[in-house]
A protein has these predicted regions:
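Short, polar N-cap/turn motifs at the start of nucleic acid-interacting alpha helices
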Residues: 57-64, 128-129, 148-169
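Alpha-helical structural elements of signaling/regulatory helical domains
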Residues: 28-32, 95, 127, 146-149
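C-terminal catalytic core of tyrosine-transesterase DNA break-rejoin enzymes
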Residues: 38, 42-49, 120, 134-163
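Active-site/catalytic core of tyrosine-dependent DNA strand-transfer enzymes
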Residues: 13-19, 62, 71, 81-128, ...
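Catalytic-site neighborhood detector that most strongly recognizes the C-terminal catalytic loop/helix
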Residues: 4-7, 13, 67-75, 87, ...
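Basic, Lys/Arg- and aromatic-enriched nucleic-acid-binding interface segment
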Residues: 1-53, 61, 72-76, 96-97, ...
Length: 169
């Protein structure tokens, strides 16, 4: 019996042109997919953290997105400061009375079917060979390398426990 192979650590970081093309494709895709992926790029949050977000977790007045411990990978509550651009995206989302989720196609459950949507996004954007989690890694890399944010702060933004930006989980 062979031992299990080591899991390959992904290190794909999207360059700025790729991010720009994905952003433009998101504009074409519209609700719910476009805004989900744009918020991933702006916040560095995990796909499920954004796609399953509820209105009660977001405060435009405070500019925050409060994730309860039950919805984070490390089971620690996390507050994400929303940029003006992220707040504007959230403010433009359809708001239906009685609907608790930011992103839903049926009014009651969070969106699903990401692999199908990812294929569509690849076609529209012309960017291939990446995964949704690469948006998070790209956020971390560009924050530290281009914006000069300290890796310790980047880890806090990403709700990391370890203090390592590499191998973004």
């Amino acid at each position: 019996i062979r031992p299990p192979s080591k899991e390959k650590i992904r290190d794909r970081v999207l360059n700025l042109d790729e991010i720009k093309n994905i952003w433009a494709a998101c504009d074409q895709m519209g609700y719910p997919w476009g805004p989900i992926f744009q918020l991933l790029m702006l916040t560095g949050a995990r796909l499920r953290e954004v796609s399953q977000a509820s209105w009660s977790e977001v405060s435009i007045a405070d500019g925050t997105f409060d994730l309860p411990a039950s919805r984070t990978k490390n089971k620690r509550s996390h507050q994400i400061q929303l940029s003006d651009q992220a707040q504007n995206i959230i403010q433009t989302l359809p708001r239906i009375e009685g609907q608790t989720l930011l992103f839903t196609t049926n009014g009651t459950t969070a969106v699903s079917g990401f692999s199908k949507v990812k294929k569509r996004l690849d076609i529209i954007s012309g960017v291939t060979g990446w995964r949704f989690h690469d948006l998070r890694r790209s956020f971390a890399t560009h924050s530290t390398e281009r914006l000069g944010i300290s890796p310790v702060i980047a880890d806090k933004i990403l709700n990391h426990v370890t203090g390592q930006v590499r191998g973004v989980a």
